[in-house]
Each structure stands twice: as structure tokens, then as C-alpha cells.
Amino acid sequence: MIGSFPELCPFPKTCRMHVLFVHKNFPAQFGHLAARLVKQRGYRCSFLSEKGPALVQGVEVIPYQVRGGATAATHFCSRTFENTVWHSAALYETLKARPDIRPDLVVGHAGFSSTVFLRELYDCPFINYFEYFYRSRDSDLDFRPEFPAGEWQRLRAWTRNASLLVDLESCEAGYSPTRWQRDLLPEVFRPKVEVIFDGIDTSVWNRVAQPGRTFGTFQIPPDCRLLTYVSRGFESMRGFDIFMKVAKRLCDQHPNLVVAVVGEDRICYGGDAEHIGGPSFRQWVLSQEQYDLSRILFLGRLDPPDLARLLSLSDLHIYLTVPFVLSWSLMNALACGATILASDTAPVREMITPGQNGLLAGFFDVDGFVAQANEVLQRPHDYRHLAENGRKMIHEHYSLDVCLSRMERLYERVGSLPRPVPPLSAPTGAEPAG
């Protein structure tokens, strides 16, 4: 934790500290911060990713190429680790060929790859971002008994953490977006892992004042109520099937209700395809009951400004998730001042306090969702204080400016720590087999 580091003077704005970010994707969680450090702090920032090369807002994006990975012959339980090693080797080989890259601090996402090989190149401190520590029980794998994880999926959960454990042991410090995510980590490592959220860009995600209630070519009549649901993919882990049951009953009870569903017809997480006999969980759900698709509108994927406008029009936004990484869509909806009714699951409870900044219902409690939704839809103005409190929470505690300032302080403190043991010389000779 930051409090455990010595109180050293932070780097002055004139100092060109060099930070190397490592993530499979760009910009991912680090892009906003890298651009800010370049512009406001005068830092040099490099970003190692599978995308590129490019110079984006002063940040050099360096591409790396993975030369191998797990195959059908690789044991199912070790494929994640095998892929991670190949990614980590590609990071090492790419930077070994760039002697001009001499960072003062390395910041990497622990998951797609490990930064531990880079310790053989650099003697600077390392910070890792820890997003999710897998567990076989009391987790996303066994939360939905109607869609049970297979035996080997449960066994694999233990080995999927292998590279995370390496990074937890080797890094000088780390951070996780929420307390719930941090507390999934083994207790022995938690003291050196801060809780710092990724940050919501409130210049985009904010309540948009609009004349009338028009979205695109769709005009929402004054006496209509608008219910919204957003998910990157339509799947059981985000409760799409539960939401559709709730939406159907609400449509039956409210002739003036319109439902807007945002997302793509794909499965991003979990093993839904194995249980439904096909790739489309949406089609499987729609085949279970009769839905009025003239009132339940599937809008596809929306650009952030359009989605912010839609959320600003919403009378009620429903969000569900199993115990898993919290969706940014919940935070975006809060930032836009939508009244939230969400599943009473651990990651959600960290953000939503019932009666203060939203409402909660049991994940499987369709009756509970319908009852509370009815109350909001009948008297939406009576619940506007919840929406306003949620909006203030995001702006005061989870906005990009607030979160990036916390990250800057962490980076400066860790970057000021004494250097670790100097690295070995970059090995030469035969390359690894594979």
C-alpha cells in the first residue's frame, strides 16, 4: 500500500521520468494515464503492445509479436500459462532489441503476460495491475448452478493464477480496481496492492441535457418510460437471461414501457455455448418465451457519446453480474445520472448502497427486480435523488482525474524506491525451442 512506502519527495514536473507500460492491447487501462504523464508531467512514456507501431499523444507504442502458444497437445489446465510464457518471451525479445528503452519504472497488466522476464533487462521498480484472481468455488464458476462449470474448468482455475503469483511475488507494488478484486488475492500479498479504479472519463460519461426525448430517429413520447440494459455481450455471466425475464414482465404490466438493450450478440466470458448447443445466448434466451421485440429494442453496440445520451434519457437502468470483474457500463450509467437497479452481488455492493445511490435485488430474484422496477417506473422522479447521488459518487471518487492522480502518486513513490538487485546481462546464444 502507498502508506507502507517511505515519504520521499515526488518527482518534479521538470523531471523526465521514463515509464514503460506493458499490456496486450492499447490503450487499455494505461493509455489515458500515459498520455497525461507525457502532457502534464513531462515524462517519457513507452507502451509495449501487440498493436502499433505508433506515436499516440506523445506515447511511443512498441509492437511485439508472439511466435507461439498453446496447442491441442498442451494440457488444458496449463494452456493459459503456456500462452502467458510466450507473450512474456515476446516482450523480452522485443525490448532486448531496443537498448534505447531504459525505463525508470515498468507498469504491466498481470494476466495476458508477465513482466518478470523484463527484470533480466532492467533494474528499475515494477508495478503490476491485478485484475482477477481465479477460484474454483464461491466464484463466477459455480454461481449459476443451471450453467455449471465442467470438472476441468474448475481444475484449470487453480493453474490460471500461476503467472499472477509470479508477478505478485516479484513486483515492488501493485494495484487493483476495486477492494473486491484486491481481496481475491492471497492475503500475504494484499499489503503491497493498492485499490485504484481505472477512472471514468466524465467529459464523455455525464448527464447530457437534451431537448425532448429523442434518440436517433426514435422519439420517446412524454408518457413513455425507458428501461435500459448494457452489456458487451449477451451472456449468463451478465444476467442477460434474468434481465429478459424481468423486461418481459415489465412490458406486460406497463403498456407505455420501451426497453433499450445495448451490446453485441456474442459470448465474452464463460462457457454458455457448451450449455445451449450454439454460439448465440441471445437467440437461446429469445427462444424460451414470447417477447415483444417491437418494444424491446436491440440497438447493437453504440459509440460512447451515443450511449451517454441514451443513459441520460433512461428512467431505470438494470445491471446484473455474477461475482466477476465489474463492468464499466455500470459506472458509466452512474456517471450519466441513471437510476440503477442492480444485482446484489459482491462486486456491485462495493459501488451501490441500497436507498442511497441505487437499488439492489437478488441476482435470481425476478420477482424482486420486477417489484422494485415497478416502483421506479411508476414514480421515476421519486428516485432521482438516488441517481444524483450515484452521479456525484463517480465524479468525486471515480472520475478519470481523481483516479489518475492516485496512480501518479503511486508511480512516483514506487519510482523513488531504491533500485532492486541489478539485472543479469541479456543472455545470448541459442533461442528457446518451440
Where are the model-predicted features located?
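Short hydrophobic beta-strand element within catalytic cores of glycosyltransferases
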Residues: 339-342
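Conserved donor-binding/catalytic core segment of Leloir-type glycosyltransferases
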Residues: 216-238, 244-249, 259-260
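Conserved acidic donor-binding segment of nucleotide-sugar-dependent glycosyltransferases
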Residues: 354-355, 359-366, 375-380
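Acceptor-binding helix/loop patch of EC 2.4 sugar-transfer enzymes
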Residues: 68-77, 124-162, 203, 207-208, ...
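Aromatic "clamp/platform" in nucleotide-sugar-dependent glycosyltransferases that forms part
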Residues: 322
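N-terminal subdomain of nucleotide-sugar transferases
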Residues: 9-60, 65, 418, 424, ...
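A short, well-ordered alpha-helix in the C-terminal region of glycosyltransferases
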Residues: 368, 375, 382-397, 403-409
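Nucleotide-activated donor-binding/catalytic signature segment of Leloir-type glycosyltransferases, i.e.
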Residues: 267, 273-301, 305
